[in-house]
């Protein structure tokens, strides 16, 4: 089950059914089924609080992923700061929707075991995000007229 909730912030405009289908397709491409994934959309202040409390880090971030996966099933809690998503969209000259989808899939990629701790693994993570984003019809991200998801192919 994939759930989308908020923590004292307005829910972003998402077609949860389509996004869930996309997440499942990407997970399957990495050899995983989907267990329970909870996406929690929050503010910068809340993600800073989570970062301090659970990770001992005293800085803002766009995403924190708590991984409860098994060898065959991805599960976890994924906190996403919508404030940072908005800032990053401006910084990287992307639409808010595209950046939000990038961060959503970034969390899933962590659940599949992908890392981004070195320049090399960070670059590989970006390539994998781009590949997953290319599977989403551009209209779904607000960039064209057709609103269907493309199949996700390896």
Task: Please give the residue ranges for each predicted region.
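An acidic/histidine-cluster motif and surrounding catalytic segment
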Residues: 1-100, 112-154
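Short active-site segment of divalent metal-dependent hydrolases/proteases
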Residues: 105, 109-113
């Amino acid at each position: 089950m994939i759930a989308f909730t908020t923590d004292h912030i307005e829910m972003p405009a998402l077609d949860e059914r389509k996004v869930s289908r996309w997440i499942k397709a990407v997970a399957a491409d990495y050899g995983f089924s989907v267990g329970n994934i909870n996406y929690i959309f929050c503010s910068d202040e809340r993600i800073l609080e989570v970062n301090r409390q659970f990770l001992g880090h005293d800085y803002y971030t766009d995403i924190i992923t708590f991984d409860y996966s098994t060898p065959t099933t991805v599960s976890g809690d994924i906190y996403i700061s919508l404030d940072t998503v908005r800032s990053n969209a401006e910084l990287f000259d992307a639409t808010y929707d595209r950046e939000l989808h990038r961060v959503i899939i970034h969390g899933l990629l962590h659940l599949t075991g992908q890392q981004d701790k070195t320049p090399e693994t960070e670059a590989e993570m970006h390539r994998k995000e781009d590949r997953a984003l290319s599977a989403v019809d551009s209209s779904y991200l607000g960039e064209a007229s057709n609103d269907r998801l493309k199949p996700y192919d390896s």
